[in-house]
């Protein structure tokens, strides 16, 4: 049997932000107001689960003191798809896809980033940020004989448009292995080791030729 869920999602976001340039001892205040509308849902079948969302945002960003070219009205469309497929008694396949399509070059607070613990793990947090892009992950998880402990191997990839006016893009890809321990409704621990696949160097910090390690911990209260 299968079970499906679908709902409308809508809301209003108001944010008061501040950009600090510590080197120059200056800061800029900015304000963002946005409406979003879309759908969220999931589908459960025999040995599978799929969750998804599609949200359209329309908003306006204003700066208090200066105009850096990214203020004004903007529109963007975000999608998220997460699929889990059971391949056997101890193996599951996890596929994640995230994307953003924007009408213009966006302020950094609205941009889409590829690198990081929840993105392409071979790259630093926030690496390769732009207004439009996608990021995908395919991961195999193996349940061990130790309760709540599993091993993983994964591939991450993605592309982002850095500047709409000149069509500048970056493509990143990486692979890695991980181990996680999860206590349902209590806490979650995970360690990942990742290396890049296409030789694309870091731009946000010095290159790390020996790979990258991430440690994540979540606690439910």
Task: Give the location of each predicted region.
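Polar, glycine-rich mid-to-C-terminal structural blocks
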Residues: 2-4, 9-11, 18
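Soluble periplasmic/extracytoplasmic beta-strand elements of cell-envelope proteins
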Residues: 7-11, 53-55, 98, 190, ...
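Outer-membrane beta-barrel translocator/channel fold
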Residues: 15-24, 189, 193-212
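C-terminal outer-membrane beta-barrel translocator/porin domains of Gram-negative envelope proteins
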Residues: 16-149, 153-162, 206
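Short glycine-rich, acidic/polar surface loops and turns
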Residues: 137-139, 174-180
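Short, solvent-exposed loop/turn segments at secondary-structure junctions
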Residues: 159-163, 197-200
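Glycine-rich, small/acidic residue-mixed loop/short-helix segments
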Residues: 169-172
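Outer-membrane beta-barrel "beta-signal"
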Residues: 179-186, 191, 208-221
